[in-house]
């Protein structure tokens, strides 16, 4: 069979050129709008609908959507709990640079959920997330150093990580740091600092902080109380409040 060499009319060529154009690519704005729509559905408890929005984005390489899909599987929201699938999605997101996913990969390695327990990898990913500013990762690094879990035990380094996190408004870290200042673990004993951090933690429902705060107050002089209350007022005026999206829980100590 011979191949026709007949020229295509100009009008037909224009039609061919038009239909051959690629579809318009989704912009970052499109992705952001879809992610936000998914978040709103998630907050309303419409997990399955959120998954329908996030999954295509995740499969297309969006690391934030990948983290959300991982969270759905980790927590069993709209799907059956599956730590293995959660780990796979978190890993994709973590490798793409998402700090929360990096923290969750570290937590899964530490607890042996969805992957074989490996404290070397747990510390590696947790440290990366902590350095990228994730509060749960910073808290967990403090726990690792306080317990000597996967790292050489160091109360000094534990206090340093608790402080990084506490200064960004992480309430449990504020409570831990306040305790360390009260008893002098990893830091020099300081009732004013203890009062500051225990007060900030206590006002957000950390019961153990309130109990210990009473002990601190009972040992303080009038001048110490005055200085401590002024310091608390300064910190409250800053409005530091770290309320990150729902992710895997911090590792219990």
Predicted regions located by residue number:
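TPR-adjacent "capping" and linker segments in tetratricopeptide-repeat scaffold/adaptor proteins
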Residues: 20-33
């Amino acid at each position: 069979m011979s191949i026709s060499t007949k020229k295509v009319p100009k009008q037909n060529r224009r039609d061919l050129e038009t239909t051959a154009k690629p579809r318009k690519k989704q912009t970052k704005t499109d992705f952001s709008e879809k992610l936000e729509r998914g978040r709103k559905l998630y907050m309303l408890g419409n997990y399955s609908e959120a998954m329908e929005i996030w999954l295509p984005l995740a499969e297309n390489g969006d690391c934030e959507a990948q983290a959300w899909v991982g969270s759905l599987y980790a927590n069993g929201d709209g799907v059956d709990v599956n730590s293995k699938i959660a780990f796979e999605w978190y890993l994709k997101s973590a490798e793409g640079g998402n700090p929360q996913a990096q923290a969750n990969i570290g937590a899964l390695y530490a607890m042996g959920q969805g992957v074989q327990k490996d404290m070397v990898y747990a510390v590696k990913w947790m440290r990366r997330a902590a350095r990228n500013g994730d509060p749960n990762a910073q808290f967990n690094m403090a726990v690792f150093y306080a317990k000597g879990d996967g790292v050489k035990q160091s109360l000094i380094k534990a206090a340093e990580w608790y402080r990084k996190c506490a200064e960004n408004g992480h309430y449990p870290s504020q409570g831990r740091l306040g305790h360390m200042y009260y008893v002098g673990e990893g830091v020099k004993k300081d009732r004013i600092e203890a009062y500051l951090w225990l007060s900030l933690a206590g006002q957000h429902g950390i019961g153990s902080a309130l109990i210990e705060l009473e002990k601190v107050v009972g040992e303080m002089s009038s001048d110490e109380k005055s200085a401590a209350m002024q310091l608390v007022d300064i910190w409250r005026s800053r409005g530091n409040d770290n309320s990150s999206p729902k992710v895997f829980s911090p590792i219990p100590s």
